[in-house]
Amino acid sequence: MDFRLTEEQRALRDGTRELLAKRFGRERLRAAVDAPGLDRALWRELGGAGFFALRLPERAGGVGLGLPEAVLVLEEAGRALLPGPLVACQLLAGAVDGVAAGERIVALCEAERDPVLWEHPGDCDELILVEGGAGRGGAGPGGGSGDGPGGALRGAQGRTGGACRSAADRIARAPFTSLDPLTPLARVTDLRRTAPLALDVPRLRREAALLTAAQQLGSAVRTVEMAVGHAREREQFGVPIGTFQAIKHLCAQMLVRAEIARSAVYAAAVTERADEVTAAKLLADEAAVRNARDCLQVHGGMGFTWDVDVHLHLKRAWLRAERWGSAREAEELLADGLLA
Amino acid sequence: MDLTYSPEEEDFRARLRTWLGEVLPGLPPKPAARDWPGRRAYDTAWQRMLFDAGYAGLHWPRDAGGQGATPTQHLIFLEETERAGAPYVGANFVGLLHAGPTLAAEGSPGQRARWLPPILRGDDVWCQGFSEPDAGSDLAALRTRAVRDGDSYVVSGAKIWTSHAEVADWCELLVRTDPDVPRHRGISWLAMPMDAPGVTVRPLRTLAGSTEFAEVFLDEVRIPVGNRVGAENDGWRVTMVTLSFERGTAFVGEVVACRRVLGALARAARANGRWDDDVLRRTLGRLNAEFAALWRLTQWNVSEAQHGGGVPGTGGSVFKLRYSHARQELYDAAAEVLGAGALDADHEWVADRLSSLSYTIAAGTSQIQKNIVAERVLGLPKGR
């Protein structure tokens, strides 16, 4: 047993970080806030670098790596606040033509959520609708113990579900003002089920949750760095605010959250166990959201402004926390698991 | 990122499991929680069984009498012994987990030959004389004085929070050997026999009702200079070696135990109807995630230690911070499950709930740990 990253994994992480720093630095990030359309050239560049084809076998033009490597890459994307349906394109690279190379952009949509939300509707070529997740009867308000505690959820987990695809221009949608300025959303008003797509949906859900958790982890780590960087430089009462124990303790707690989430996310990437993925998503969601809030607190009044990037991390963290299993659903599933 | 165990490690696990299956049914019943002489006898007898079977000092180096096992094997040992319900390290805690490793790392050949074998055989029990009444978390403020007189130090002062002092043979004692230099530089590390004239032990009763630790008063106790480990006034550095062992590996078996208790809590709640409480059920689900992650963090830390020279790194502070609070949340949840039964002081979960209150204080309070993480890991400036 050696849980640490291999040399190749560290190189992949560092290389991804460098690529994103070069192509999606702070200036590009702030420009995207004002004009949130996806940069097709960047998308193709990411495709060319193997960002989406990471897990495809080499004979299919892929890189032949595994889920742990995909997690490391998406952690970096989360750090950089890179926008776009990254998880969808990573998961559908082998299933939809052109996605692996970054030529076509697809999004995933969870049919059982209400409202049914679609990320980057103006930038997508196709939308893949996924059905058969944790039903609202099990996870919504007032649910949970209809047919015995956790029964509805257990049943939902067992459902195989299905997926279907639609060209983006054939989907009826209603406007929806996104909380996250970097992630435009639309509400899907007509769930078309005409073109089924053969996918292992339970597996897709599991991997989508894990890769989303990986982005949350990257964001949680980044906000620790932002808080610490600010605490070292910002002076009050003639000293850096980082000398104050109250600030130190906020920062230390942020690191603890991020590192606990890292252990959970990396382990789930290795074992691919459903319970570990659920736990990883729960802890990474919390780390991203809580760390962004604490980072905002450390930044004081400036943290509450649009000028500082903290709100972008918080809003994206909230958005991701709503996708592929909420805290409530995760806790119910994990409670149920204790009785198994 | 590899979480599979090698064939050698799996073989080690299988042999250990077989041995535990053979010997555990024949163990005498556990002594009462407050019977410290009984617990000493029980714990040292178990240590002797480990010694005879070749499992004593598993993670100690071979030249110190240990088995030279890898940190991963040590992890497997702690996992399997806890899973099988084997006795915990108990009264041998200080000797095996920090005094011994410190002596192995810093002692002279003569000191190692004298003190290490009796720890491994279960003959000697050690206690820790670090903390003082006026120097809690600020360990370097200690005032117990040692004045050189020929071949001896004459030691006077008082120690506190000394676990197992009532039944210990030896004490790892920090003393001030030079009061005129900056406070970290005038400290020495001594091995003190607990039966030396001038040593008085006054057991302290914890809020859990146990006398697991004591105050130790030292009145002109003569300790041979040859009992000093490391150079005179170099005790602070030796102490840091000790503390890194204490923080890094001391809680591994407990995480396994907490995961077992969490499952038992869920089943008990299902049986008594408390499971229908959404808040409680979600708390248990969340704790499931927490303890699973803490176990993975342990594996991460062990992997780091295995490749970084064996002394656990700062991951220990991150672990300790989260674990100490998660343990308290676990037993608070147990009280929710028990309802009025949580007022029964003899219930195992209630006793553990009480003792869990010490976890955010002992071995460096959460507040001190946060300072360590902020300053040494995150590089924030020192406070005033």
Whereabouts are the PLM-identified features?
Chain A
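Alpha-helical interface subdomain recognition
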Residues: 1-80, 148, 210-340
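FAD-binding core of flavoproteins
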Residues: 81-87, 91-225, 229
